[in-house]
C-alpha cells in the first residue's frame, strides 16, 4: 500500500508460492488491480495440494494472462469464471546473437560436419530425455547429440541408457547450469532442437530456439503444438515414442 500502485503484476508457476503470493495479492486487490501471469496452473509433476493452493492464489487476482491455450484450460477447470487473455510466451532477446558454428563447435569440443541435435535446459522426468536417448540410438553415425543442462535429481537412469545404446561416443554431455552468457554457444552449434516432453504447457526453450532460428521437433502435448503451429518452424511428432522421434528427426534432415 505504501507503493500505491495502480496495477500489481505477479508471475505464478507452481503451488509452492501460492500461500505467500496469495496472501499478498488478496491484500493488494483491495487497493489495485492484480494481474497474474500464469506459466502453469498445474505443475508438470503434480501433487494433491496443487489445486486447492492455486485456487487460493487465483482468488487474489483481478485477471490473468496465460501463455498458451493448455494453461487457459487448466485455469478454467479451477476457476470457471476466470477473466483472462492468452499471450504466447515471448521471445528471449538477452542471450545475444548467434555465433559462428565452427568456432562454437571448437569451443565445446564437438566434431565438425555432423548433424547436431540439441536437448537444452533443466533435465526433469517430464522432459523426456530418456526418450530422446533411445531415439538417438537408432540414428545413423552422422548424428551427434548435445545435452546441455542441469539434472533435477540423479542422472543415473539416463547414464544407463547411454551406456547401452549405439553411438554413445557421439553424445556430448554438459550437465550443469548454463549461464546466460553461454546459451548462444549451444544454440549456435545446433541444427535442430528436440523437445520430447511427456507433458508441457508452453516452453521457454522453444522461445530460445526461435531467437536463434533453430528448428524444433516437439511432442504433441500441452501448448507445444501451438508453439510450432503452421509457421514451418519445426515438426510436431504424432507420438512420444523413441521410434517416432527418431523417424521425425531423420525426416527433418531428408526433406
Where on the chain are the PLM-derived regions?
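Glycosyltransferase donor-sugar binding loop
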Residues: 120, 144-159, 176
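Acidic anion/phosphate-binding donor-loop and adjacent secondary structure
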Residues: 47-48, 76-77, 90-108, 113-114, ...
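Donor nucleotide-sugar binding/catalytic pocket of nucleotide-sugar-dependent glycosyltransferases
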Residues: 59-98
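Nucleotide-activated donor-binding/catalytic signature segment of Leloir-type glycosyltransferases, i.e.
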Residues: 158-184
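Short hydrophobic beta-strand element within catalytic cores of glycosyltransferases
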Residues: 215-218, 228
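Conserved donor-binding/catalytic core segment of Leloir-type glycosyltransferases
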Residues: 110-127, 133-137, 146
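Conserved acidic donor-binding segment of nucleotide-sugar-dependent glycosyltransferases
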Residues: 230-242, 249-255
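Acidic donor-binding loop of glycosyltransferase active sites
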Residues: 185-202, 211-214
Amino acid at each position: 500500500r505504501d507503493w500505491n500502485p495502480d496495477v500489481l503484476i505477479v508471475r505464478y508457476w507452481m503451488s509452492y508460492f501460492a500461500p505467500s503470493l496469495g496472501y499478498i495479492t488478496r491484500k493488494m486487490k483491495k487497493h489495485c488491480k492484480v494481474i497474474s501471469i500464469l506459466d502453469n496452473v498445474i505443475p508438470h509433476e503434480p501433487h494433491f495440494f496443487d489445486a486447492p493452493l492455486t485456487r487460493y492464489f487465483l482468488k487474489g487476482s483481478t485477471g490473468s494472462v496465460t501463455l498458451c491455450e493448455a494453461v487457459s484450460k487448466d485455469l478454467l477447470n479451477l476457476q470457471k469464471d476466470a477473466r483472462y487473455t492468452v499471450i504466447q510466451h515471448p521471445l528471449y532477446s538477452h542471450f545475444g546473437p548467434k555465433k559462428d558454428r565452427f568456432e562454437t563447435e571448437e569451443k565445446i569440443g564437438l566434431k565438425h560436419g555432423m548433424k547436431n541435435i540439441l536437448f537444452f535446459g533443466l533435465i526433469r522426468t517430464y522432459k523426456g530425455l530418456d526418450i530422446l536417448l533411445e531415439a538417438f540410438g537408432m540414428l545413423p553415425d552422422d548424428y551427434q547429440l548435445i545435452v546441455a543442462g542441469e539434472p533435477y535429481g540423479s542422472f543415473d537412469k539416463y547414464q544407463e541408457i547411454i551406456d547401452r545404446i549405439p553411438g554413445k561416443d557421439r553424445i556430448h554431455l554438459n550437465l550443469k547450469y548454463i549461464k546466460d552468457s553461454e546459451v548462444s554457444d549451444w544454440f549456435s552449434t545446433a541444427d535442430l532442437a528436440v523437445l520430447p516432453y511427456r507433458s508441457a504447457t508452453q516452453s521457454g526453450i522453444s522461445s530460445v530456439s526461435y531467437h536463434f532460428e533453430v528448428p524444433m521437433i516437439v511432442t504433441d502435448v500441452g501448448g507445444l503444438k501451438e508453439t510450432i503451429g503452421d509457421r514451418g518452424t519445426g515438426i510436431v511428432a504424432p507420438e512420444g515414442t523413441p521410434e517416432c522421434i527418431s523417424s521425425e528427426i531423420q525426416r527433418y534432415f531428408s526433406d
